[in-house]
């Protein structure tokens, strides 16, 4: 009876994880592509223009921050659902994946706070008038740390996603080809971020190549878990 309850919880967790994957992907893409990229607000290397853009589009910028907070709140729920689903496969590895992903969300929230602080100063005309050009540049650098911090975020996302996808592959809950693609795309993301740290000049070249595969993986996995669910082998009595 207890085993049956556990399996039922896994089925429900799988459906929930699928839904959360898709919702988090939608909110994440909105924030990154509509607010941050292509940069209608943020102009790299031009602090004054960035400050002017944020002041002129403060509501949009605030929506982007709120959207990011929602995205990472969803991520926490997703991490929990994946843990419930994969705990019976290997509890220790599932916990390791949870810790990796929680570090990811924690760092991301710190980045969001920095972005919010920069906006608070930049959007206040009285504050802005009190700053000289060097101080405005410093505020711009504070905002630029958002992008830099997300390199570290992506590293921990890659680590956690690799472990979760390994457990999905080992469990046989989903098609192995889908889990294998998840492992590949997660490792690709992980390696690419270290490459950017060591060779920053290649960042613009490899970003599409490293984020594209994992985006495809999370969308495909989300649809599969939500609409197909998982196949959990029955334990021998």
Pin down the residues of each PLM region.
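Hydrophobic, aromatic-enriched alpha-helical segments typical of multi-pass transmembrane helices
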Residues: 1-237
